[in-house]
Every structure is written in structure tokens, then in C-alpha cells.
From Swiss-Prot:
Keywords: Amino-acid transport, Cell inner membrane, Cell membrane, Membrane, Symport, Transmembrane, Transmembrane helix, Transport. Signal peptide: none annotated. It catalyses: L-threonine(in) + H(+)(in) = L-threonine(out) + H(+)(out); L-serine(in) + H(+)(in) = L-serine(out) + H(+)(out). Belongs to the amino acid/polyamine transporter 2 family. SdaC/TdcC subfamily. One of its GO terms (molecular function) is L-serine transmembrane transporter activity. The gene is tdcC. GO terms for cellular component: plasma membrane. It is a multi-pass membrane protein. The chain crosses the membrane at residues 22-42, 44-64, 97-117, 140-160, 163-183, 207-227, 259-279, 319-339, 366-386, 389-409, 423-443. The keyword Endoplasmic reticulum does not apply. This is Threonine/serine transporter TdcC.
Amino acid sequence: MSNTESIIVSQTKTTSWRKSDTTWTLGLFGTAIGAGVLFFPIRAGFGGLIPILLMLVLAYPIAFYCHRALARLCLSGSNPSGNITETVEEHFGKTGGVVITFLYFFAICPLLWIYGVTITNTFMTFWENQLQMPALNRGFVALFLLLLMAFVIWFGKDLMVKVMSFLVFPFIASLILISLSLIPYWNSAVIDQVSMSDLSFTGHDGILVTVWLGISIMVFSFNFSPIVSSFVVSKREEYEGEFGKEFTEQKCSKIIGRASLLMVAVVMFFAFSCLFTLSPQNMAEAKAQNIPVLSYLANHFATMTGTKSTFATVLEYGASIIALVAIFKSFFGHYLGTLEGLNGLVLKFGYKGDKKKVSVGKLNTISMIFIMGSTWVVAYANPNILDLIEAMGAPIIASLLCLLPMFAIRKVPALAKFRGRTENLFVTAVGLLTILNIVYKLF
């Protein structure tokens, strides 16, 4: 083999798909698959078969183009080791850094409130329906669960991180297993209800409004934005010095594309399996009861008439336990991000950025009291979870995931080559439609 051929073979090996690329693909995929996925089938199936088919068409473009836009923003900084906050400060100054810190905090903190409501409702429905125990006081249940999680966080954060990381893929496997196991219980109710003469495209329950609201729940459920900055830094340090920024951008796009495909395949299969097992009316009941779809499935199998199979009995209990584990996992993961963001805000505005004025322990205590206290208040109030996602969680995520990168592409010279592309209009539309949910909820 000639020297030229040896060089070509060597370059092909080094620039081809690496083990680290597979690891990050699974990491992005695992970050997105959490408790939010348990509400997607409810919103997607609420309007019947046609809206969920339209959401199926939109799911991959939303997941891929939005996260790729955020990754490109992270890639635009001059420092390969700089995170998104540093990159935004580089482009827009200190004010931009403060804005991104606020956005990150307010994108994650409402998710904790959502998970606080969810875990309270999931535990209470499991206690009353599966264990057949008398109803408990809601405030007491919420306080007990939050204190339990606070205890674990305070005394075993490192162990918690390891356990939560370990639980990611068993949870994904459980979702796939449940989706497959529901196939024998599929029925044609959702198909039978499709009537072309009764179809309505406008109005409160029309297809367009259902899909519009579905976009916000997709932004929420198909979201691995919290890890994109770390992912880009890792890939830049691995590839940029040797192969350049353009190659690194292409590699990041491929990884995001594969992670998005995995995510959409698993979540949409789970959603369709739930919809064919239940019905749009069942999804409406789940929304009214303010519980995740796994808890509703557990109650559904608990009320089955006649002789139940062993599988139905196992699913009745297993679905609730899997839901509880998923919510615990998501709560812990988002708590760490919220704590970091709130610590930064308290330090910046309470102590003028001087780390010598306050200890890390005191910062953590102040932040924990605020986070757990506000989460308990919301959990006790029990607002509708889907309404909270659509009016608060998803719009803030969309502003960070969709609109911030699009604004940067228009204003930052380093991103000028991405201007004028069709996908930019799509990402902007997704962001604006998600934020407009706030207006819709008000009226």
C-alpha cells in the first residue's frame, strides 16, 4: 500500500463514526426520554387519529432542526471549551449572559413544579387505586415526597446522579416493552371515530388547534436542550483542533439527527400504542384527572371486567411504579440544573458576583428552600399539568431552543452562512406558535 493510500485510510478511520459519537447519540436520546413523555400521548391522542398523524409528520423536523439550531449557536463561539453562556456573552455582552442565565433557570424551574404536581398525583392514584388505601391529605403527601427527595439530594447527590444515569435506559426499555405488550389490547375505537363529514379544522377542538397545542407538548417532550451545550463542547474538543469547525458542525448535526430519530421512533410508537389501547375519550379523562398516561393505563387495567390475565395485573402495578421512577429521575435531573441556575442568580444579584461573601453550602440551602417551597405550593394547588406545560414550560423552552438561535443567526457574523435557509422559517414558526399558547390559554 502506498503512502498516499495509507494516509487516506488513516483519515477515513479517524473521521468516521466513533464510539464517542454513539455514546453522545444515546446520551442526547436518554436526556429527552423522561417524565414529559408520559404526557405526550394524552395531548397527541386527545383529538383522535388525524391530529396525531400530523404530529407524526412534524415530530422529527421539530426535534432535529430546533436542536441543530441551538448546537450551531453553541459552536459559534471562539473558545472551543466555552459553554452557551460564554458564547452568548461573547456575541451580546454581559447583558446577554444575564438573559441566558435567566432563560436557563426559568426553562427548568417550571419543570420541577410540573414534576411536583405529577409525582403527587401519581403517588395518590397508586395509593388509592392499586393499593386500595384510604385517601390521604394532598398537602401532606406533597410535603412528604418533596422532603424525601430533599433528603436524598442533600445527603447523597453523587449516588443520586449515578442511580439516575443508570435508570435512563431501563426506563426507555420499559417504555418499549409496554408499547409492545399493549398490542394484544389494541382496538379500532380511534379509527371508528374518524368521520370525514364531521371533521373540523377550526374551532377549539378543531384539527388545527389540536396540532398547534400538540406542537408545544412536542417541544416539551422532545427536548434535550439542557445537554446540548456540554455535547457541543465535548465534540469541539474532540474534533475541531484536528478537522476544523465545519467538520465538527457536520458531525454534531449527524449525532443530533440520529438521536432525534431514535427519540421520535420510541415516543411516537408509545403514543400510538396507548391511543390504540385506549380512546380519545380516555385521553380526555386522563387530562381531567391530571395524571400521566401510565397511571391512567394502570387504572384502566384495574377496572377491567371479567378475569384479568397475569399480564394485565402486572401492568396495573408496573405502569404506576415505572411512572413514579420516571418522575423521580426527571425531578432529580432537573433539580441539579435549577440549583446551579438559582445559585448563579443569587450570587450575581445578592452578593454582586463575589464568591467570597457566601459559602457553597449556604447558597445550596437558600436555593433548596426556594425550590422545594415553591414546588410544594404548586403541587398543593394542583394546576392542570398539560395546561402548565403549554402555558409555561414549553414556551420558555421554545424561546431558548428556537428563537434565541434564530436571533443569533440574524445578528452574529459567525452564523451568517446559515441565514436565508428554509429550516430557519420552520424553527421560528415552531418557537412563535409555542409561545402564542400563552395568549391562547388567556382567552
